[in-house]
Design a protein with these regions (language model features):
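Core Rossmann-like FAD-binding/catalytic domain of the broad FAD-dependent monooxygenase superfamily
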Residues: 1-317
Length: 317
């Protein structure tokens, strides 16, 4: 099921507007933050000028370029892929015209493509195709009408040009914040971890962050639980960001872009064996649906974090 981010955001906004304790401020930019032992404040710039807001905790969910993360001095560890990804959206019906399912992955020795249907404002909906680009090409070349048509036609030849209703080019990273907690500042979503989009794990991982963190914040704020519980949020969600989201999304990309014939044959054989074995198929689905990562997070304890910390100290001594 595809539920675009703008739709989930709209649903959340509608729900928040019904909460008397929530104030929603659009067109505001975070400039700086400061925290004491008892509170944290954030300085923002909005339509009426600069203002300050204070509270018990601050959640930085302000995206991959998070100001909250940077102002908190938290490193964003990982790497950036050399190639950019381009998304081309078209009303062309790949199911009716070519028999494609709603989510398809194409692994060609020369390149790869994702093709999936989104409902948009439909029916009938739209189809999005995603491709890697040549790092040596300029943005103008890639995004030109000629460049866009050449790319989509190379995968899906058609006698007529495709109608392209949206095109987007973006840089892709694999990064995880060094910590999801710094005192009264917490990170969630893309501010805490980013990855390539193959498999749809970024937004879904952020939703899992929100569920985990909100549960713990409620217990700290309303049930007088020790705020050490928030250290567990950091440990649980950072563990799965590294062990599941990063590992799986990188593996997804490498599987699609493999060009060596023997590697490609092994990959396909492995997928066939998985599809033919009910237990392997079940484990594959648990992992790709991120159910397994949620269960892994629930099993992580602060004691495990202490053992890891001690292990790092021993290694460095």
């Amino acid at each position: 099921m595809q539920c675009e981010q703008f739709k989930s955001a709209k649903l959340i906004l509608e729900r928040l507007r019904k909460c008397p304790s929530v104030e929603i401020l659009f067109d505001h930019e975070v400039l700086d933050l400061a925290q004491t032992a008892d509170a944290v404040s954030v300085e923002v710039r909005g339509p009426s000028g600069i203002a300050s807001h204070a509270g018990a905790f601050l959640i930085g969910a302000d995206g991959g370029r998070s100001t909250v993360r940077r102002r908190s001095g938290i490193a964003f560890e990982g790497f950036t892929w050399p190639e950019r990804f381009i998304v081309l959206t078209t009303p062309y019906d790949f199911e009716a015209e070519r028999g494609y399912c709603y989510r398809s992955y194409f692994a060609d020795p020369g390149t790869w493509c994702n093709c999936f249907k989104v409902s948009a404002d439909g029916p009938p909906g739209l189809w999005r195709t995603v491709y890697p680009t040549d790092p040596t090409q300029s943005e103008d070349e890639i995004m030109s009408d000629a460049g866009v048509q050449a790319r989509i036609q190379s995968f899906f030849p058609s006698p007529a040009p495709y109608e392209i209703v949206h095109r987007n080019l973006y840089v892709t990273h694999q990064r995880v914040a060094a910590t999801f907690r710094n005192g009264r500042v917490l990170l969630a979503g893309d501010a805490a971890h980013v990855n390539n989009p193959i498999g749809g794990m970024g937004l879904n991982g952020g939703i899992q962050d929100a569920v985990n963190l909100s549960d713990k914040l409620i217990r700290v704020l309303l049930d007088a639980a020790p705020d050490r519980l928030l250290d567990l949020y950091d440990l649980q969600r950072r563990t799965v960001a590294n062990e599941f989201v990063q590992e799986q999304s990188i593996a997804n990309k490498k599987r699609l872009e493999a060009s060596d014939p023997q590697t490609r044959a092994r990959n396909l054989d492995d997928l066939r064996r998985t599809a033919a074995d009910p237990e392997r198929a079940r484990q594959f689905l648990l992992r790709t649906s991120m159910i397994a990562s949620q269960r892994r997070a629930e099993g992580v304890t602060l004691a495990e974090g202490y053992v890891r910390s001690c292990g790092r100290k021993r290694e460095s001594s």
